[in-house]
């Protein structure tokens, strides 16, 4: 049995900025319309994966900021 190709496998390697830029492009294509149902579903799935990647980056940034604040200690 052949392994299925994941068209969204490249997303894990994207920076936040790259993922966000691609997400904006996907949303634009979906809003423009004109794509077939199959293409629209593929775009939607990619958009969901890109949004998850952005959330992962943002959550990582929140954790790093919290850790930095904890290391700095109370300022007051």
From Swiss-Prot:
Biological process, per Gene Ontology: DNA catabolic process
InterPro entries from the UniProt entry: Exonuc_VII_S, Exonuc_VII_ssu_sf
A single GO molecular function term of this UniProt record: exodeoxyribonuclease VII activity
Enzyme Commission designation: 3.1.11.6
Keywords from the named record: Cytoplasm, Exonuclease, Hydrolase, Nuclease
One cellular component term from this protein's GO annotations in UniProt: exodeoxyribonuclease VII complex
Origin superkingdom: Bacteria
Record's catalysed reaction(s): Exonucleolytic cleavage in either 5'- to 3'- or 3'- to 5'-direction to yield nucleoside 5'-phosphates
Pfam families per the UniProt record, alphabetical: Exonuc_VII_S (PF02609)
Location relative to the cell: Cytoplasm
Major enzyme class: hydrolase
Family membership: Belongs to the XseB family.
Its job: Bidirectionally degrades single-stranded DNA into large acid-insoluble oligonucleotides, which are then degraded further into small acid-soluble oligonucleotides.
NCBIfam families reported for this sequence: PRK00977.1-3, xseB
Summary of subunit composition and partner proteins: Heterooligomer composed of large and small subunits.
Name assigned to this protein: Exodeoxyribonuclease 7 small subunit
Species the sequence originates in: Arthrobacter sp. (strain FB24)
Species classification: Bacteria, Bacillati, Actinomycetota, Actinomycetes, Micrococcales
Gene: xseB
